[in-house]
Amino acid sequence: MIYEGRILNKSCIEKRFIAFKFVNILRELGYIKYIVLKKETTDLIYIKKGNDKLLFDKNDTSSLLNVYAYKECKEIPTEKAESAGLETFFRFTDIIGRELVILEILHKYMEKYSDAIFYVDNGLYFTKQDIDRIYNLKEPDAEWIYKNPDTYKK
């Protein structure tokens, strides 16, 4: 099964500006832009610095990260998100094997946009407080995306 994750924000926030900030976060983490495609959604593919070849190690899933930035269109993944006035700003596809990379990205993103929510297709929602708790664990938990965030409350 392939899971996807979405960063949700209030729909009144300027999407183009946030997309620019998101790219800066990825660059800070060592990703470089490789391809930008499509009109309504921007398909951003990033390759980890140091991976200067176009060939990928199929065992290193974190070396390629595929993120759709919704700058022109509106996607609301659930009724719960709609009732909270949230819509998709960024969608991570095929998140399996990239859980810790996504956690690091979310931690940096939510430092700037603390009202953002991370939604996973398995029905789980993560707030900034949830992400902070998981990010600050003594031992990284690569399975965090598949666990209820309440698991990490003390």
PLM regions with names:
Residues 1-44:
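Short, extreme N-terminal segment that most often corresponds to the first beta-strand
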Residues 1-4, 8, 100-154:
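Acidic, proline/glycine-rich low-complexity IDRs
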Residues 19-20, 38, 59, 68, ...:
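Generic alpha-helix signal with a bias toward terminal, lower-confidence helices
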Residues 28-97:
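Short, intrinsically disordered low-complexity segments
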Residues 1, 15, 42-47, 54-57, ...:
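Aromatic-enriched hydrophobic runs in primary sequence
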Residues 17, 63-65, 85-87, 114, ...:
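Alpha-helical structural elements
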Residues 11-22, 88-117:
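Ampiphathic alpha-helical segments that act as solvent-exposed interaction surfaces
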